[in-house]
Every structure is written in structure tokens, then in C-alpha cells.
Swiss-Prot record:
It is found in: Cytoplasm. It comes from Eremothecium gossypii (strain ATCC 10895 / CBS 109.51 / FGSC 9923 / NRRL Y-1056). Pathway: Amino-acid biosynthesis; L-histidine biosynthesis; L-histidine from 5-phospho-alpha-D-ribose 1-diphosphate: step 4/9. It comes from the Eukaryota. This is 1-(5-phosphoribosyl)-5-[(5-phosphoribosylamino)methylideneamino] imidazole-4-carboxamide isomerase. Its EC number is 5.3.1.16. It is an enzyme of class 5 (isomerase). GO terms for molecular function: 1-(5-phosphoribosyl)-5-[(5-phosphoribosylamino)methylideneamino]imidazole-4-carboxamide isomerase activity. GO terms for biological process: L-histidine biosynthetic process.
Length: 263
């Protein structure tokens, strides 16, 4: 059934909420649009999620200079949080010393955005399928009716389409998908209902142990019920800028935890 999943986004060593589409991979790129900068430590949020048993919550390193902050969060709740951002075949096992799973994205593609299945096979072999999440964050394609997987902080389109065939193929090597709708991420203007419904249809065809998590635009605790209805309970939901723990005024963290307890 649809559950609330927590996130801890790290940027420049601090817990932040950023409008996802404004991140840049260029050293001289413009500063991202930031909704919230926390005065609390990453470990504070790790304890918060762990003490409320918000399973599947993740830490994402958005750019450089976040290793120390990521370790602080992971070591505050060993084996509880997932870790994403800059995960490669060379460091995945290092992070799995403290993370429950690692999340991989750009490492699966060449610099031009061409998907490399062999890279996924290699990382899956190192981590184990059960401890690997593939991030298929996406933008709507120019036709308006399909989605393209993005990499490099959602700035670079890849050759991979987000569809049933892609999920079926990749699920042989991972146990979970994390999908940010980059077009609406951080805007608090509502979820991409069409994408959530499609994810539910595609998830129904996957192995029973595969989890699908959607992120982007959620602005009400009622969105949990909406995602449950649209996806048939096959897709989980994460909140960011709308949450009170991230300075938001639209969604109470404890209401989301109460939803999980009721499911």
C-alpha cells in the first residue's frame, strides 16, 4: 500500500530543499533556487525518520562537499537510510557500510546520456539486487505524452525512456525505483497525476518485491490518498518543501506518519 517516504537532501553540507530543475552540474553555474535551509543537522532528520519508522527514507547528496553530512545522517541510524547522489561502482560498497541501500543514477549512462546496461549489471553484482535502487527521475518529453529519464542533476536528457519496458528490464538488477518528476519538483503545485497513474500500471507488471517511490509537487497530506488511488497502492510518496520539518506550512510530518501507521 502507498506509504510516506522521507528524504534528506544535502547541498553544500546542509539540509536544504531546492527547486530540482534549477540545479547545475557546472562549477560556474548559477546558484539553485532554494526553498529552505535547515539549522538542524542531518542526524536530526535521520533520528526523526528512524524513530517514526519511516521506512525507505533516503539521503541525497546534491553535488560535492556532502560526504561528511551524509555520513552524519547514515551513522545516526545505521542500516536505516538509503544513500544517493554520486554513487558509482567504486564507492557503492563503501556507502553500504551504513546505508540500507544505495541509489544510482548518472553512473548508468555515458557522458552523452547513452544508457549502459553493463554498468547496471556491474553495480548490481557489487551491491546485490536487494540493496540497489535505480533513480529514474524524468521530465516530460516534447510530445507531452511520455517521459525521458534525466541525469546530471536532471539537466541532461538520456536515451532512456521511462516506460513499462524500462522498468521491467532494470528490475532484474534492482529492488526499487525512485522517480522524481523534475518538472514539478520543489514547486509544491501538485503531483504529476498522469505519471503516478502510469507508474501504478507499470508497477503492477513487476515482481512483487519491487518498490516504486514518486517525488515531486506533493502539497497536501491528501496526496497520499490520491497517489494510493491513482496507482492502486503500488507507488509510495515522498514530500519535500511542503513539509513542516522543512519550513513548509502545507503538510504536517506527524500527519504523514499517522497515515503510515494506518496502512
Amino acid at each position: 500500500m502507498t506509504r510516506f517516504v522521507g528524504c534528506i537532501d544535502l547541498h553544500d553540507g546542509k539540509v536544504k530543499q531546492i527547486v530540482g530543475g534549477t540545479l547545475s552540474s557546472k562549477p560556474d553555474g548559477e546558484a539553485p533556487v532554494t526553498n529552505f535551509v535547515s539549522d538542524k543537522s542531518p542526524s536530526h532528520y535521520a533520528h526523526l525518520y528512524a524513530s517514526n519508522d519511516v521506512q525507505g527514507s533516503h539521503v541525497i547528496r546534491l553535488g560535492q562537499s556532502n560526504d561528511e553530512a551524509a555520513l552524519m545522517a547514515l551513522q545516526a541510524a545505521p542500516g536505516f537510510l538509503q544513500l544517493g547522489g554520486g554513487v558509482t561502482k567504486d564507492n557503492c560498497q563503501y556507502w553500504l557500510q551504513w546505508a540500507s541501500k544505495v541509489i544510482v543514477t548518472s553512473a548508468l549512462f555515458d557522458s552523452d546520456g547513452s544508457f549502459q546496461l553493463q554498468r547496471l549489471r556491474e553495480i548490481s553484482g557489487l551491491c546485490g539486487r536487494a540493496r540497489l535502487v535505480v533513480d529514474l527521475s524524468c521530465r516530460r518529453a516534447s510530445d507531452g505524452a511520455s517521459w525521458t529519464v534525466m541525469m546530471n542533476k536532471w539537466q541532461t536528457p538520456t536515451t532512456l525512456a521511462l516506460n513499462e519496458e524500462t522498468l521491467a528490464l532494470l528490475s532484474e538488477y534492482c529492488s526499487e525505483f525512485l522517480i522524481h518528476a523534475a518538472d514539478v519538483e520543489g514547486l509544491c503545485r501538485g503531483i504529476d497525476e498522469e505519471l503516478v497513474a502510469q507508474l501504478g500500471l507499470w508497477a503492477a507488471q513487476l515482481r512483487g518485491d519491487v518498490r516504486v517511490v514518486y517525488a515531486g509537487g506533493a502539497n497536501s497530506v491528501a496526496d497520499l490518498g490520491l497517489v494510493k488511488r491513482l496507482s492502486g497502492g503500488r507507488v509510495d510518496l515522498t514530500y519535500g518543501s511542503a513539509l513542516d520539518i522543512f519550513g513548509g506550512s502545507l503538510v504536517r510530518f506527524q500527519d504523514c506518519c499517522a497515515w503510515n501507521r494506518q496502512q
